[in-house]
């Protein structure tokens, strides 16, 4: 068996990365793609590797030189018109090579783990196209297969239909052809197709024609979770660098992204909590039905959004400002009330108190913390520890603040997930404590809409709210987020049911976590469960282990925080933990 790599393309979409180099010279985590794949091919006992080169071909040949002479025999074919042709011409230049031996055919812009090549080489079937179930990041040629893994259709980019994605598999651009298949089927069709359609086409089009006109001997070989990525642009390169980072670096590579984990479909994010039982399918269907209109329309200004949010919260429009997530709330508060000073969070000191291992605190603890501060933030329920103070205890602190000229800012984003907590967001409470209380809530979090970034800040002090509004851009949330706010009241009973489901699942999840000997599980009434590691590992070490198993978690010191997700997702995590 031999290998052929098509490496003649210019890779224009990679911009500066391919300004002076071909795509396979691009580095992922300090290793060039060409070095990686040659080493992988070198472990397969192949007779030779044939590289079809073009753009910056001499530079590639000079780089390879004789460094792999003891690994694999390397030969070259030149495509002198690489800038006027596509990969069908590069492959046509190698047609005689294809007919000489069984061949692994690869493109030069893919990165994959070792098992990918082992999977296709070890499979006894002679003619295979490696494929993977469609995911949102995939682009290019798709195939449809039957239950025998026969390819019934090649779907070019122009024929792609999003409504059919459940039936699509993406070609990984790794093929295995027997020399008989190349000689008797593929190469004759390749010659004919090139003569009719020209040389600015893709070689997959030939396979598409074969499936239409010929009982093809080519079968699909679906991957089973093996990692791979196609690198077409700088964003792809960034994602591939994260996917293929080494064990110690991988967790930090993911963590520094902060979010956007939808780009990694295999990853389940337990680092940030959100309501997994809301919105309902019906609410999402309503949002989808209006999506085209919403993305083509400007959102309303602050006053309209505050009116809608106030209606949902049960408070007057003049007491509410709508923000683009909690991050915007904290930013505007620092610029208005705190004049650039750091916000003080109540739990920060308690985290350092070894005499309080469960991080429990009550009204008296908060008052003591407040003694030398003009204002502070109380997260209730606390997202880190899961501690939750009853409404009467929180109001005890607010009363004390009022008597001492201080301000308590309460973040109650998780209050609907708690057993004991109760919202402070009402006209009566806000008006009574207009000088000493401000309330914040992340609607995105409680309603399971983290991608829409919606938060509210409320106070009975209308002048303060007015100042906050003036410091926030009028169009600070988009039309889709505004629409979600607008229709929420229609689904309020579903929302309440979702919170009950959340509490029930958290109880089950906590009980299951308590069965692991390496955890001390701290009781929680928030959207996450805090676990102390008792096996000597640090949180970072533990999270590094989890990320290798496609689980993202967060923590500090010896404490790991695990968000409560759906039963299905939680069971995935429990299965991972059981195998440790």
Name each model feature, range by range:
Residues 502-507, 513-549, 564-566:
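Conserved PLP-binding catalytic core of the aspartate aminotransferase-like
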